[in-house]
Amino acid sequence: MQRPNVDDDMTLVTDFGKTEAICVDVLDNPATEEGVLLKVMARGPFEQGQQVWIVDRDGSKVGATVENVSEQTIDSEVTLSTVLPA
């Protein structure tokens, strides 16, 4: 999976099912050497600490952890931390 860009569409698989997300920010994670923080807008009952899968276009999956959730109207701004494979 490549590092996403702002405005990229993403698919997340969670314990409540699949949901679509839009990437709004991509940052290096200072807590981990290879880590990335992804801010996405998505719908669903996300909770801090929740584990999710990010599904790439080719169907491969990368695990991520919900670091922060900010409620916005119907959508939520969700910050995910992950390590993307090289």
Q: How should each PLM-predicted stretch be described?
A:
Residues 13-20, 54-63:
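Short coil-to-beta-strand transition motifs
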Residues 1-22:
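N-terminal helix initiation/capping motif
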Residues 21-25, 62-70:
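Short beta-strand-centered aromatic/proline hotspots
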Residues 18-35:
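Short, basic/aromatic beta-hairpin or loop at an interaction surface
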Residues 31-39, 70-85:
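Short, solvent-exposed secondary-structure boundary/capping segments
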Residues 51-53, 64-66, 80-82:
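Detector for the mature cores of small, proteolytically processed
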Residues 5-11, 41-55:
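Short coil-to-beta transition motif at edge beta-strands of beta-rich domains
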Residues 1, 85-86:
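Short intrinsically disordered terminal tails
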